[in-house]
Amino acid sequence: MVVTKPATQRPRLPSVGRLGLVDPQAAERMAQLGWYDHDDQAHVDLLWALSRAPDPDAALLALVRLAETPDAGWDELGAALLTERPLRGRLFAVLGSSLALGDHLVAQPRSWKLLRGNVSLPTHDELCAMFTGCVDEALADPGSAMVRLRTLYRDRLLVLAALDLAATVEDEPVLPFTVVAAHLSDLADAALAAALRVAEHNVCGDRTPPRLAVIAMGKCGARELNYVSDVDVIFVGERADTVTTRVASEMMRLASEAFFQVDAGLRPEGRSGELVRTVESHIAYYQRWAKTWEFQALLKARAAVGDAELGRRYLDALMPMVWVACEREDFVVEVQAMRRRVEQLVPADVRGREIKLGSGGLRDVEFAVQLLQLVHGRSDESLHVASTVDALAALGQGGYIGREDAANLTASYEFLRLLEHRLQLQRLKRTHLLPEADDEEAVRWLARAAHIRPDGRHDAAGVLREELRHQNLRVSQLHAKLFYQPLLESIGPAGLEIRHGMTSEAAERQLAALGYEGPQSALKHMSALVNQSGRRGRVQSVLLPRLLNWMSYAPDPDGGLLAYRRLSEALAGESWYLSTLRDKPAVARRLMHVLGTSAYVPDLLMRAPRVIQDYGDGPSGPRLLETDPAAVARALVASASRYSDPVRAIAGARTLRRRELARVASADLLGMLEVTDVCKALTSVWVAVLQAALDAMIRANLPDDGPQRGKAPAAIAVIGMGRLGGAELGYGSDADVMFVCEPAPGVDDSAAVRWAASVAEQVRTLLGTPSVDPPLDVDANLRPEGRNGPLVRTLASYAAYYEQWAQPWEIQALLRAHAVAGDAELGQRFLLMADKTRYPADGVSPEAVREIRRIKARVDAERLPRGADPNTHTKLGRGGLADIEWTVQLLQLLHAHEVPALHNTSTLECLDAIAEAGLVPADEVDLLRQAWLTATRARNALVLVRGKPTDQLPGPGRQLNAVAVAAGWPTDEGGEFLDNYLRVTRRAKAVVRKVFGS
């Protein structure tokens, strides 16, 4: 029988399981330390203290290693741990947080005594004195100098980390992040000064060393250093001679071996530049060559060690340049490029774990703060501070950001920096990566090291995950608000004002820095939006900071803001509009990109606003892609058929066309559609409009008396020509057509033709009526005899004409002929008739081919518009659309009788057939294909950006950047887009010349 012992006789010592120890050897290690030999209260408290270490197993293992080290004085340490709560908290916390500092303690076992008693952080001067004393002792034995300095540096890190972490184990004071970061910077200064002294000794011996100032940059310069970080420096010498450079180089080597990596990459010309420059050389560089990012870097500059007078001269000379950098001509362009570069630095697979460069991370805060300092620092000296936390406070105090926002952003920034410190302490390695989401053990360790405790709903790891989500989201939201909320408060109604709001001049400076070329107009638009009465103004005030931030990344934020104002005013009565933008960030972000890129789409959206709701994502992907162009075409024809009045029928057709154009153009701008899909969708809707218009006019013109009452005197088919026939229409394309008719039984040809011509002319007139929508021009000039020929012919008339009189250009035009609307059977018969002309059994005559070559030469010489650049005209320029299409058509004329696959109206499909048949080498065909696709994308992009048909690419500037973005290139890469266009078309032109034999 088992007898339960009374409670007073049960062991008081907690088991390893209750302590949270999971290492299989934990119990053995406890016994090795003798901690299970006594069950008094002191040992109970000791064990529970160990359990509170961030990683108690790691702490226990380090203690065992320390106990096994002869010089550690374990008996003294073991006894002290039982009675000295502060020592216990510091030692357990640091051993449970940092494997590297545990290794240091084992290597320097007596260093635990640094954590004993009333420990405080030394001042900057006291640290410098410690390192100076160490150097004085070490120089007597130069071989050991850096070893001693390295040990001293690690000892001081140990003390700081222990004080920083102690509160996780015992009730010890919490060190503020700013104190930790400043002390790390002081420690770096002392270490650099020591390395400089040793370097001077190594290089100069007993000679007087050269005057050299070391300027700390980055986080060290701002006194906000990490536990593990490169220390960025710039060297300033009285003379930039060999000896001074050797001292600087030796200092970098010694410091990098003993303390931390020293990086001089921020110096003028970077790693390609001289390591040491004089003050005068620095001044000359920054006056002539420095980029905006280099002035931004100077915000953190601080004379750290070395010659103080030289350092002061350097700062006095260069800092005034920092505060006028925002007036530089290329400031805005470079700032926008820097913003985008920050976002592109992070590999996609770790973006969610990046605490520094990820979305809502540290760099978001730092970049935004530095930009606001550059913009407003010229007129406000209170912003001339180096650290991020101090700058946030100054920006809030000055009204450049809301004070509550400044406080929230500071809290988020300090939280993220705390996590960064804990991650780096673990192995004293430079890292910014959070643990993998499914690495429960690593997440739990980080939470405990950051002094995060369970909250009743989540364990520590769960609380950390929630807090990270909250802080990242808050930073992302405040990042946008940071730039724009104070602007709105400076122009908004009384209820939005802050006590010391931004002046209008400051608001204009800030908008200009964010990419707005007309900041005064932008402020007027913003004012009109937020000063609306009632709910709309309030919602706009909430929405605009985020919307304006997204829009600032578009190529034309000025045009985008105007379009947004017009759209908002046009949809003022639509309650869903602002709600959608508020509740669906993906919709709002995509809309801002479209509005800030295109002049074509905003007008369409004002009359087809429901397309905006399709900017979001559905279960299967983007909702803009859920619509089938063929279904749209059927719906358009059906909608028009419900009206007996042709005008109303076409109005109904225009409505559906407008919506489809808005959908296709939006999806195109957002990178969701390939250019070939765009062309097919545009062709589909054009064909549907032609069908609807033809049906409406036939209904309106049916005879109301006589034997043909209620019956059409003729069947009519519409033959698509050019890009319409090839299903390759762009946004600015006309519809090239021919009309063919066939008399109804009992109707003579002349009457049938007159009636069909009247219908065709009415179709052209009705569709061509000026409208707010993109034009619907129907061009019939490719018919036999061109403008001089009859608008409509019978099938027999066409056959007779082509058999007897067809000119080479008319044969060439027929290569693109395709039945698109009207009587399908008649259309097919027309194509069979046309095949005899365009694909004759024995091939086209040599005379016709020579004539085509002659016409092409004349087109090249004469048809380019006056003043056009032949290198960048997308239609008629070198290697443009006409070049590629004429080349394909010449090969069709020469070989279609031998290669049935060339009986095709599509340029791209014919190119595939040409390559398959070996008529042109495959690599050359690919050059033609790439040129056609490139020119088509560019031509479509021109219409999307400018809002009207045009073929000429603009020169370098904002509009070219917009065209590049609309064509699928990243923002600010207009130059690369143009270079690519020129390269692709130049190579294609060589193939064109080869085929044409010129």
From Swiss-Prot:
Keywords: ATP-binding, Magnesium, Multifunctional enzyme, Nucleotide-binding, Nucleotidyltransferase, Transferase. Its EC number is 2.7.7.89, 2.7.7.42. InterPro entries: GlnE, GlnE_rpt_dom, NT_sf, PII_UdlTrfase/GS_AdlTrfase. GO terms for biological process: regulation of glutamine family amino acid metabolic process. One of its GO terms (cellular component) is cytosol. Pfam families: GlnD_UR_UTase, GlnE. CDD domains: NT_GlnE_GlnD_like (cd05401). Residues 492-998 are annotated as: Adenylyl transferase. Its cofactor is Mg(2+). One of its GO terms (molecular function) is [glutamate-ammonia-ligase] adenylyltransferase activity. Residues 1-487 are annotated as: Adenylyl removase. It catalyses: [glutamine synthetase]-O(4)-(5'-adenylyl)-L-tyrosine + phosphate = [glutamine synthetase]-L-tyrosine + ADP; [glutamine synthetase]-L-tyrosine + ATP = [glutamine synthetase]-O(4)-(5'-adenylyl)-L-tyrosine + diphosphate. Involved in the regulation of glutamine synthetase GlnA, a key enzyme in the process to assimilate ammonia. When cellular nitrogen levels are high, the C-terminal adenylyl transferase (AT) inactivates GlnA by covalent transfer of an adenylyl group from ATP to specific tyrosine residue of GlnA, thus reducing its activity. Conversely, when nitrogen levels are low, the N-terminal adenylyl removase (AR) activates GlnA by removing the adenylyl group by phosphorolysis, increasing its activity. Belongs to the GlnE family. This is Bifunctional glutamine synthetase adenylyltransferase/adenylyl-removing enzyme. It comes from Mycobacterium avium (strain 104). The lineage of its organism: Bacteria, Bacillati, Actinomycetota, Actinomycetes, Mycobacteriales.
